[in-house]
Amino acid sequence: MQKREILEKYKKEEERILVAKLLDKIELCEKRNKMEYTDFLDEYKESMLKKVLNLVKTDYICFGGYEEAERKLLIVYPEKLNQVFEENKFNFNTIISVIRINPLKEEIKNLNHRAYLGGLIKLGINREKIGDIIVHENGADIIILKEIEKFLYTNLCTLKRFKNSKIEVVKLENIINKKQEMQECKIIVSSLRVDNVISEICKTSRNKASENLLSERVFINGRIYVS
């Protein structure tokens, strides 16, 4: 299927741009006979691009730094690398890095996922360059593209919220991974308003549910819900 035919399937400009970028990377992969990869994708974008890859029949793998990652890179690669990826011999540390932030104990309680992400955005980092942010009892492990590692390592300490924190770069195999717990819920709601549904699922007030929405803690089909 030709590039133009594929792009015509997508009416939203954001989706067309994303698909076009992927198709460009596939062309580069074939032309240069070397792997190419996207920025970090949320679950919705990953699912959409996988459908494109099924149309063009290109070898690919999705990886976000650890097995349970929600945000992943999509890597397309030439036939010569089939064995490398099939036998898990590729060193992902060459394209993905992890910045560990260890704040002072008395400051940890004031830092949540949004605070860590906000710090990166304040430094001018594009969200797509950032993978999962794993918040743990000692701080956070932030998965990023290798290309921004040096900049973040040098500049994170210039932010007031991190000025007393220990900043270090760690390997993917040393990520402090908190296992996600999944729970299936069956609820009855008076309306399908999102805050109403969240309130019932979390057994909390509508106001608290609205706070979670504003804090970008709610995902629907892999995408942050924006009211």
Residue ranges of model-derived segments:
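Ferredoxin-like alpha/beta domains used as RNA- or RNAP-binding modules
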Residues: 1-201
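A basic, amphipathic helix-loop patch mediating RNA/tRNA/ribosome contacts
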Residues: 188-227
